[in-house]
C-alpha cells in the first residue's frame, strides 16, 4: 500500500509540474500581450468547451479543463501574471492560486464547507455557472427589456440570473451609460454585461462582483467613453498576507481599467447573477444616462489618472526601496561586526594594563581571614587602667584580672 501511495503522490506531483511547464498563453491560445478582457474571453470559451458537465466521463476533456483553469488562474491575477512574465512558471505555484468554484456544480455538503471557509476568511472566488453561460451562448435565455432611467427591484435565486436588455440611441450612447445594482440585505451578486454573437447568443464580456460598502452591497459598470478603473481589494489583501513588509508596493496592482469603455447605439444586455451560497438575492437595478454627471465624470477621470500615476511611482519607489534596504542591511551587519571588534580590543587592552604591577597577586580568601583575625583580637582585648585588662568572654560577662602585684616586697618592708 505504501508503494502504491508513493506512486500516486509522484504521479500527482508530475501532473502539477507538467501544468507549470505549459505556457498559459499557449493553453488559452492568446498572445502574451493580451488584455484582461481577451484573457477572460478565451478562458470562458475554452472552459465552456471542456467543462465536465458538458463532457461527462471524458478524461481528455477533464484534463484540458484543468489546464485551462490553471492557465487562467496564472494570467487573471495581476501578481501571478507578473511573476510568470518576469521569472517563468516555476515561480507560480499552488500557494499563489485562489480557490475558484462553480457553486452550481457543488453538492450540499461541499457548499456548506465552502460557506464555512468563506466565513473564516478564506478568499473563495466564485464563477458564473457554466450551464448558465452555455444557455446564454446558445441564445436560450429570456431577457426583460428596460428603458434608460428605469429602476427595477427583484429577487433572483442563487446561481441563477435575470437578464435585461436596453436599447440606446446615438445621443444616449454618446452621453454615456451607468448600470448600478445594490442590495440592502448585503447579498452577494455579480453584475454581468454580454456581447451579442453572430448566432444570436450572448457571450460574457464584463463581470463585476458586489462589494460591501456601508449598509449595502453594490456593483457598477460605467461607460463614459474613456477608461474607468476597477479596484479588487482581495488582490491587495493577498499581497499583504504574502509579504506584509513590501505588500504596500503592490497595493495598486489591482487597479485595472474596465475592458469596455463605451457602448454603441443599439441593444445591450446586462444580467444580475445570484452569488449567495444558500439563499436568493434581493437587489435593485438602475440603468441611467451619465449626461447629468458631467462634473463628476471629469473629477473621476482626473482622480483615476492620479492613481495610475501613483501606481507608476510605486513601481519606481519599490526598486529604490529594495536598493536602499540592501544597503541598510549591509551597513547594519557591518556596524554589528565593528561593535564586536571594538569590544574585543578594549577587553584585551584592560587585560594587558592589569598585568603591569610589581605586587604579587593576593589570594582574596586569606586576606579576608587575616583581617577577621585582627578584628577579633581587638574585640577580645580592651585596655583599662594600668595593670588591669578586661577580658570579654563568649557569654558577654567581663571579668577583671590583676597582674604584676608584688606582694612579697610589701611583706619585707613590714
From Swiss-Prot:
Q: Provide one Gene Ontology cellular component.
A: membrane
Function field: Plays a continuous role in plant development probably in the structural organization of compartments. Seems to be involved in early gravitropic signal transduction within the gravity-perceiving cells (statocytes).
Q: What is this protein called?
A: Chaperone protein dnaJ 39
* Entry similarity comment: Belongs to the DnaJ family. C/III subfamily.
What taxonomic lineage is listed for the species of origin? Answer: Eukaryota, Viridiplantae, Streptophyta, Embryophyta, Tracheophyta
Q: Which species?
A: Arabidopsis thaliana (Mouse-ear cress)
Which SUPFAM superfamilies does the entry link to? Answer: Chaperone J-domain
Region (Disordered) location: 1-36, 362-395
- Which regions form coiled coils? 296-324
Question: Which PROSITE patterns does this entry report, sorted A to Z?
Answer: DNAJ_1, DNAJ_2
Amino acid at each position: 500500500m505504501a508503494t502504491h501511495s508513493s506512486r500516486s503522490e509522484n504521479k500527482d506531483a508530475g501532473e502539477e509540474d507538467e501544468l507549470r511547464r505549459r505556457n498559459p498563453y499557449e493553453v488559452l491560445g492568446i498572445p502574451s500581450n493580451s488584455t484582461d478582457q481577451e484573457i477572460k474571453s478565451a478562458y470562458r470559451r475554452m472552459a465552456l468547451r471542456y467543462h465536465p458537465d458538458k463532457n461527462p466521463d471524458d478524461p481528455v476533456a477533464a484534463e484540458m479543463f484543468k489546464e485551462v483553469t490553471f492557465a487562467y488562474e496564472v494570467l487573471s491575477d495581476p501578481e501571478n501574471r507578473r511573476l510568470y512574465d518576469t521569472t517563468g512558471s516555476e515561480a507560480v505555484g499552488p500557494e499563489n492560486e485562489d480557490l475558484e468554484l462553480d457553486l452550481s456544480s457543488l453538492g450540499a455538503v461541499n457548499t456548506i464547507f465552502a460557506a464555512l471557509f468563506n466565513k473564516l476568511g478564506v478568499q473563495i472566488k466564485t464563477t458564473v455557472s457554466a450551464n448558465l453561460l452555455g444557455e446564454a451562448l446558445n441564445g436560450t435565455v429570456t431577457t426583460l427589456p428596460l428603458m434608460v432611467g428605469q429602476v427595477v427591484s427583484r429577487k433572483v435565486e442563487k446561481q441563477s440570473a435575470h437578464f435585461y436588455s436596453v436599447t440606446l440611441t446615438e445621443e444616449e450612447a454618446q452621453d454615456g451609460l451607468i448600470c448600478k445594482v445594490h442590495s440592502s440585505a448585503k447579498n452577494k451578486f455579480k453584475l454581468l454585461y454580454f456581447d451579442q454573437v453572430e448566432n444570436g447568443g450572448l457571450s460574457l464580456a464584463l463581470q463585476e462582483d458586489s462589494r460591501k460598502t456601508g449598509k449595502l452591497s453594490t456593483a457598477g459598470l460605467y461607460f463614459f467613453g474613456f477608461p474607468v478603473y476597477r479596484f479588487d481589494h482581495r488582490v491587495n489583501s493577498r499581497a499583504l498576507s504574502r509579504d506584509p513588509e513590501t505588500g504596500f508596493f503592490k497595493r495598486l496592482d489591482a487597479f485595472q481599467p474596465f475592458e469596455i469603455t463605451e457602448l454603441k447605439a443599439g441593444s445591450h444586455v446586462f444580467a444580475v447573477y445570484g452569488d449567495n451560497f444558500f439563499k436568493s438575492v434581493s437587489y435593485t437595478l438602475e440603468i441611467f444616462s451619465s449626461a447629468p454627471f458631467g462634473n463628476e465624470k471629469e473629477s473621476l477621470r482626473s482622480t483615476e489618472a492620479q492613481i495610475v500615476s501613483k501606481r507608476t511611482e510605486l513601481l519606481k519607489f519599490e526598486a529604490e526601496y529594495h536598493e536602499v534596504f540592501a544597503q541598510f542591511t549591509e551597513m547594519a551587519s557591518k556596524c554589528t561586526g565593528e561593535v564586536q571588534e571594538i569590544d574585543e580590543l578594549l577587553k584585551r587592552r584592560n587585560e594587558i594594563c592589569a598585568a603591569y604591577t610589581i605586587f604579587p597577586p593576593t589570594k582574596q580568601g586569606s586576606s579576608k581571614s587575616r583581617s577577621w583575625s585582627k578584628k577579633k583580637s581587638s574585640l577580645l582585648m580592651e585596655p583599662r587602667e594600668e595593670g588591669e585588662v578586661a577580658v570579654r568572654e563568649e557569654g558577654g560577662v567581663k571579668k577583671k584580672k590583676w597582674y604584676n602585684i608584688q606582694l612579697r616586697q610589701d611583706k619585707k618592708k613590714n
